[in-house]
UniProtKB/Swiss-Prot annotation:
InterPro entries cross-referenced by the UniProt entry: Aa-tRNA-synt_II, aa-tRNA-synth_II, aa-tRNA-synth_II/BPL/LPL, Asn-tRNA-ligase, Asp/Asn-tRNA-synth_IIb, NA-bd_OB-fold, NA-bd_OB_tRNA
Protein name, UniProt field: Asparagine--tRNA ligase
Principal localisation: cytoplasm
Quaternary assembly: Homodimer.
Gene Ontology terms describing biological process: asparaginyl-tRNA aminoacylation
Molecular-function annotations in GO: asparagine-tRNA ligase activity; ATP binding; nucleic acid binding
Superkingdom classification of source: Bacteria
Primary gene name: asnS
Reactions catalysed according to its record: tRNA(Asn) + L-asparagine + ATP = L-asparaginyl-tRNA(Asn) + AMP + diphosphate + H(+)
Class in the EC hierarchy, top level: ligase
Cell compartments where the protein resides: Cytoplasm
Keywords: Aminoacyl-tRNA synthetase, ATP-binding, Cytoplasm, Ligase, Nucleotide-binding, Protein biosynthesis
Pfam families noted in UniProt: tRNA-synt_2 (PF00152), tRNA_anti-codon (PF01336)
Length: 435
């Protein structure tokens, strides 16, 4: 006689009208003195388990009746179809074994404040909505890699510890690195990614990046995941086309693969998808200032376009908008100066609507050795720390462009979330390093 199969909630369709073993956690329980309905979580899905006193007997039934939330159990029973249950199946319990007790689980079904929930993040991840966000994140990661692999981009794993500043020296996490001075947690993989275009033309990286920004806004994390791409021989205009196609493609694929999860989050994706049906407008920084000034904003050339002003522009254009050619002083040393207006650089930020803000920053890179040395000096960065990077401009330098996208902001947009802290399993913010 064959053993009773151990089955996950993911594979129930193969075992209808059979005796099976299900291992999982008590998500909830309700019922009467004659029958109890147990919600059993396994593989991220909830299976309804019917426990009847007539079948189980008084002692086992009382054990079931007094189960606590998040108790881990092994249940044996007959699997039947039930269209009224959450996933179309129901398990009629024959026996149950408690694997691990759950005493006074802190996250009960009642309402809790966000500070409490973030402090209990290691447990909060078990909730239906947080699990749905994790699945959307997973689907986005898959869509990102699929997009690049289908277009002959090569994945390059760039270092987390570096001796070179990629963005702003004021937003670095630093640590002593043996006898070699300071090392920094990478703000970007871009500088290292650029080295690989000379080997494979089109490359990308996807991993954690770190910014020691003293910001407590709903759009900022000190640790976040960024996907970056670099393309040899690509112009600024070609870079914009790639970014738009990339964003539209990965959003559509993620939404398609996350239909049930978005339902759990009560997120209607229709307005989001509608934004993707038209071309993203491209406006110069100078034009953006003119529009903002016409709306009564007190802003002059050289000022930052803050988050509130970004949203004014997305409302003006009815969706995402590229803002290009920012003042050179406001942008990184590696961005190519605009030959038509040396006050600006050939860069662009993609601004998303609905309060999301900038989701992509990209530019054509400076390929000339003398020009980039001059930019390093302007930024008061130690030229000797970039000898390896400058070598790229000595040996077969070519025009090239690239971009970076912060995945947490994109996840927030897809899920309709107000804060990026729920878009990463364990958020790191100014005031939070635990759990």
């Amino acid at each position: 006689m064959s053993e009773t199969p151990i089955v996950s909630n993911h594979d129930l369709g193969k075992y209808v009208d059979q005796k099976v073993v299900i291992q999982g956690w008590v998500h909830g329980i309700r019922g009467s003195n004659a029958r109890q309905f147990l919600s059993l979580r396994n593989s991220g899905k909830i299976l309804q388990v019917l426990a009847e006193k007539e079948i189980l007997g008084e002692e086992v039934f009382q054990t079931v009746k007094h189960l606590r939330q998040e108790t881990s159990v092994t249940v044996i029973g007959n699997l039947v179809k039930n269209e009224k249950s959450p996933i179309g199946f129901e398990l009629v319990m024959e026996s149950i074994q408690i694997v691990g007790e759950s005493e006074n689980y802190p996250i009960t079904p009642k309402e809790h404040g966000i500070d409490f929930l973030i402090s209990q993040r290691h447990l909060w991840l078990r909730s239906s909505k947080q699990l749905a966000i994790l699945r959307v994140r997973d689907n986005l990661s898959f869509a990102i890699r699929k997009y690049f692999h289908e277009r002959d981009f090569l994945l390059i794993d760039t270092p987390i510890l570096t001796g070179s500043v990629g963005e702003s020296a004021g937003t670095l996490f630093s640590t002593e690195y043996f006898d070699l001075g300071n090392a920094y947690l990478a703000q970007t993989g871009q500088l290292y990614l650029e080295t690989a275009i000379f080997a494979h033309n089109k490359v990308f990286c996807y991993g954690p990046t770190f910014r020691a920004e003293k910001s407590k806004t709903r759009r900022h994390l000190t640790e976040f995941w960024m996907v970056e791409a670099e393309v040899a021989f690509a112009t600024h205009a070609e870079n914009l086309k790639l970014q738009e196609d990339f964003v539209k493609t990965v959003i559509k694929e993620t939404v398609q693969n996350s239909f049930q999860d978005l339902k759990v989050l009560e997120r209607d994706p229709a307005p989001l998808l509608a934004y993707l049906e038209k071309d993203f407008p491209v406006i110069d920084y100078t034009k953006a200032l003119e529009i903002l000034q016409s709306k009564g904003e007190d802003i002059v050339w050289g000022d930052d376009i803050n988050s509130e002003r970004e949203q004014i522009l997305t409302v003006e254009f009815g969706g995402p908008v590229f803002i290009q050619k920012y003042p050179r002083e406001a942008k990184a040393f590696y961005m190519k100066v605009n030959p038509e207006d040396p006050r600006t650089v050939l860069n662009a930020d993609l601004i998303a609507p609905d309060g999301v803000g900038e989701i992509i920053g990209g530019s054509e890179r400076e390929e000339n050795y003398e020009n980039i040395v001059q930019r390093l000096k302007e930024e008061k960065l130690p030229v000797e720390s970039y000898d390896w990077y400058l070598d790229l401009r000595k040996y077969g330098s070519v025009p090239h462009s690239g971009f970076g996208l912060g995945s947490e902001r994109l996840i927030a947009w897809i899920c309709g979330l107000a804060h990026v802290r729920e878009c990463i399993p364990f958020p790191r913010m100014m005031e939070r390093l635990y759990p």
